[in-house]
Every structure is written in C-alpha cells, then in structure tokens.
Amino acid sequence: MLEEAGEVLESVLKASCLPLSFLLFVPAVLLLLGPPPAAEAAHESTVYRMQQYELGGQPYGTRSAVLNTEARTVEADVLSRRCVMMRLVDFSYEQYQKALRQSAGAVVIILPRSISSVPQDVVKQFMEIEPEMLAMETIVPVYFAVEDDELLSIYEQTRAASASQGSASAAEVLLHTATANGFQMVTSGAQSKAIHDWLIPSVEGRLTGLGGEDLPTVVIVAHYDSFGVAPWLSHGADSNGSGVSVLLELARLFSRLYTYRRTHAGYNLLFFASGGGKFNYQGTKRWLEDNLDHTDSSLLQDNVAFVLCLDTLGRGNSLHLHVSKPPKEGTLQHAFLRELEMVVASQFPEVKFSMVHKKINLAEDILAWEHERFAIRRLPAFTISHLESHRDSLRNSIMDRRSQVDTKALTQEYQDHCGGFDEGHLQPNREGSTCRSADLHGSDADPGGAARISDGLAEQSAQAAQLIDKDSTFLSTLEYYMGRYLKDVKQHHVKADKRDPEFVFYDQLKQVMNAYRVKPAIFDLLLAVCIAAYLGVAYVAVQNFGLLYRMIQRLSLKTKQQ
C-alpha cells in the first residue's frame, strides 16, 4: 500500500495535477497568511486618560478607563466598538462627536513630540475644544498619546485600511475584511475608581513686619496647580506656574529687605501657595475657613490691608487688575492700583494696563478668579493677570507649556509688582525704617529670578491637583523655596467630606497601551471553512483512492505517449 502511495505521489508531481497539488500546499499557504509571532506584533505606548472628576456633585470627563478594541480612523464608515485614532493636526470637534455618536469603543488622540512645532491655529483650535470635551460627559474612554515612529506607523496603516474600505466595491471590502491585518488596542489597567481620601496640600509662609502687634497684613496668593483635558499632560507653565514664580521671587526679595532695619517695613507679609485652584479654589476656601472660623489668632483676622492674587503672568503685552468692587480713593488698594499703573506707564509703555470690574456671580458653579474667595469673606482683594477674561482657554489647556511662556514678559510682571510696593504702600512704622521702591530695584533685586524659578518648576512633572500629594516632588520643591525665604512655613491640607464631597478625583489617569497585530474576526471563520474544505477533499480522495489511482495512471500514460 505504501509503495502504491509513493507511486501516486510521484505521478502527481510529474503530471502537475492541480487539484492534488493544491491539497498539498494549502496548509503552507494558510500558515503564511497567519499573523506574525506575538513578540513581533506588540507595541507599547504610554497613554494619558482624559479628566474624570466630580465637582459640586457634577461629573466631568470620561467615566471609563478600559480599552480593548480594534483600531480605526475617522475615515472608516463603521466606528462602532472600535478604537478611533486621530492626530492632533487633523483633529476637530466634529470628528470627535462623530466617534461618540457611532458608539466608538475608545478614542486615542495622538499628540506631536513637540507642541512648539504645531501651527498656532491648530493649537488655538484645540484649546477652544478642550472645555467642550470636558463638559460633555461620556462613557467612552478617551486617551492621549505622544507620537513615536511605531505609533505613527500603526496610525498610517490603520488610516490606509480605513480609507480603502470606503472607496472599494462590496466584494473588495469583503475580501479586504477577511485578509487584512488590523491592530487591537489594549490597556493594562483596570476600571477607574473614586479616590475618597485624597488630600489637596497648600503651603503658607510669612515675614513679620517691624513694629507693634497690630501691624496691617498684605497677603500674596497664587495657586500652583495646573489643569487641562488630560491631567498627566497639564504642565500649566503660564497658568499658573508664572504666578507661583512671581510669588516666590517676591518672597526672596522681601526676605532680603526685611533683613535690614532701614528696609524693614511695618507690614506683615503673608504668602500662600494654594492647591486646588482649578477646582473652585478649594485650598483657599479651606484656608480661609481655618483662619477665620476655627481659630482666635490669625493674621487674616486682624488687619488685612489687601490680598494680591497672581494668576497667569507669563505672556503678552497686557496687564489687567481684576476686582469684584472698585477700590475707593484713600485706601491702600487704590494707592496700589495707581502706583502700579504709573510704573507700567513709565517703565513699560508698550504694556497695556487696565482695571477689569466683574461682580461675583454666586449662581455660577465655579468662581471666576481667586480673589473672589477673599471678597466673599469681606477681605479687600484683587487678581493681577495678563488675561482680560477668566474664560480665556489658556487657563485650562494642555497646550500651556514652558515654550509658550515669554521670559521677557515674566520679568516685566515681576518688576511691575516690585514697583507697586513702593513707599506709598510699605510705609515706615518708625523713622528710618522705610522700604522705598529704589530698594526694591536695588542690588538685591533679580529681574531674571522669576524666569529661573519658572524653569525649575517646569522641570517637575505635571502639576495637576490629582497628581500632587503631600509627598510629591513638586510640593517638596515649592516648600523648599518658600522655606529659604520665609518664616513659619507649613502645609495645609484639604480633604473632601465623605458624606457630601465637594470634589471627587478618580485614578487610572496614566496607563500602558499595547497594540497587537491581529486578523479580523471573520478571518477565523474563513480559515475554518478552508480547513473544513481541505479535510473534506482529502477524505473523499482517500475513500476513492482506487478510482483516483486509475485516473492518475491514465493521465500518466497519455503524458508518456505524447
């Protein structure tokens, strides 16, 4: 029997019998069509999830973190239960809504390696879209990834496959669907969970004035946390890294001036770097409650001259003083306003200065500016910013990077504030103890110090409130700077109430996404049909081996006769 089988095989090869040759080579063809080894098919990328939080009982952002779907681009006709990949340069809010309307399984937005290389019109458009993305709560997981060569290659292959399906015929689409390679996107993390015991830290420090016990107090405040559509990408170099930089440089300068009797003014200076500024100024709110409601001895309870809030000072040729109530003539706030206006006009004539009056709208869920927290507690306060409106998209964008901050503008803001604190505001408490503007601009002043501090803080990781706890590197750096220049430096912490929390943060904000090269599900069905057909033909051939043998003999004889 084996001899006959060998003779049959030899005859098949000599006669080039197509049906049996096909049967013999089908397994090899199927192996070649199969997916490559798993080790060569996987690619890892770090992805950053969109914001997920609750503020005042209102949820924002995405509610899901699990990603395990096949990749497509917006060019595909069907996006349902697919991971829709988009590049920033091609991104639009209409495309984003299209993906959500079609019940996409996930959305991954690919960002360029360097934001500075992106055209400004694209940056501006995306900054305007960010608030709309957060306002529209969705169950679809939304991630951001920084491009690399492998990820771009995956995107281009997926885009080509998606585009070809839209322009091909039905038969071509079916064939392409059955044979094309795809990419399965899978994240490594679990579903997001609420963090109920998160602490928002703030840092306080002070300089004591020269004189009696009832000295007036000037409070200088800046919130340090950043905000954007993705917490891990929110660096906040301008909003509000620039404000914190100016606060620290003012602390350094006044610490030197308060060292000498001649320049030691009769004012207490209280510096406060607040946390949770982007979440309705939670750090400032709790700090005021602790100092005004829960203690009998506090600088905020005694004689507050005014509160100066620093917010977004690192760009542009404009400077705006935001107030809830215009200061009255004869008050220290009015004198500060006039002196600041004079300094800007005389030393920086190219800078546009104005006062912006906006009443506090208690019906809004989120306060516009930080000084409104103080104004609600009847403390005279105002905010200085280069932004004319609190609705400016720059305040809440992942596009706010160090490369976007103008070092010259930051230095000007610092010098403006130094000029504002002249002898009209830091009056001598006794003869010979006057702090004059000449001293503020003297040898101890360092106009470039604010820019250097900004560079130092920018080297830290993202400064979103969800990422900064009491042991974070950024907070340690901030506390170190304040400890060098100020006295009684200490932290304050805010923890949400368990029964009725004002804010709730969620985890799983940073994950690893694996891209696996896969065949579509229909390929398994097609493969099963081919294997079944192959086995069926083989079975019939074996059952009718005698007939097959005689047929091959006749073919062989004809070949020899020819």
Curated annotation (Swiss-Prot):
A GO BP entry: regulation of signal transduction
Signal peptide residue numbers: 1-41
Molecular-function GO terms, alphabetical: ribosome binding
Xref: CDD domains: M28_nicalin_like
Subcellular location(s) per record: Endoplasmic reticulum membrane
Pfam families: Peptidase_M28
Main location: endoplasmic reticulum
Sites where a glycan is attached: N240
Family of the protein in this entry: Belongs to the nicastrin family.
Name of the protein in question: BOS complex subunit NCLN
Species of the source: Gallus gallus (Chicken)
Lineage, uppermost ranks: Eukaryota, Metazoa, Chordata, Craniata, Vertebrata
